[in-house]
Design a protein with these regions (language model features):
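Central antiparallel beta-sheet cores of small beta-barrel/beta-sandwich binding domains
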Residues: 3, 8-91
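Edge beta-strand at a domain terminus
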Residues: 99-101, 107-123
Length: 123
């Protein structure tokens, strides 16, 4: 995942939300930052956000932290920030065999109780 850029899709509206870029530290731990907002009305400031991020730019914001490779195309043990709700969730990722899609899963407690989003690789 290191260096790759992904288009996030809102699971409620099925519309593109942002581009995020993954990076990896020297220990192999991944994080991801928002590189671009794809919703024109939210490009400069997040008017839909609550709390900390209301009316602030989200460009450069680290939304994924501490994601670790746990097997072929599988990453887990991370966290993801939802700036709109100002909440942080546990986070895991499974990359498709062709490397073009990933299933992002955010959850509280156990993974069985959570939500999936499909993100698409940007070349």
């Amino acid at each position: 995942l290191h260096g790759s850029v992904w288009k996030t899709i809102d699971d409620a509206t099925n519309q593109p939300r942002a581009l995020v870029r993954f990076s990896q530290d020297k220990n192999g731990v991944l994080s991801a930052n928002i590189e671009k907002i794809l919703v024109p009305s939210e490009a400069n400031k997040c008017t839909m956000c609550e709390g900390t991020y209301k009316n602030k730019s989200l460009i450069g914001l680290t939304i994924v932290k501490n994601l670790k490779n746990v097997g072929q195309n599988k990453y887990d043990k991370g966290s993801i920030l939802d700036p709109q709700s100002d909440k942080t969730y546990r986070f895991s990722v499974t990359v498709s065999p062709d490397g073009e899609k990933l299933t992002a899963r955010g959850y509280i407690g156990i993974s069985a109780i959570g939500r999936n989003q499909t993100w698409y690789r940007v070349k």
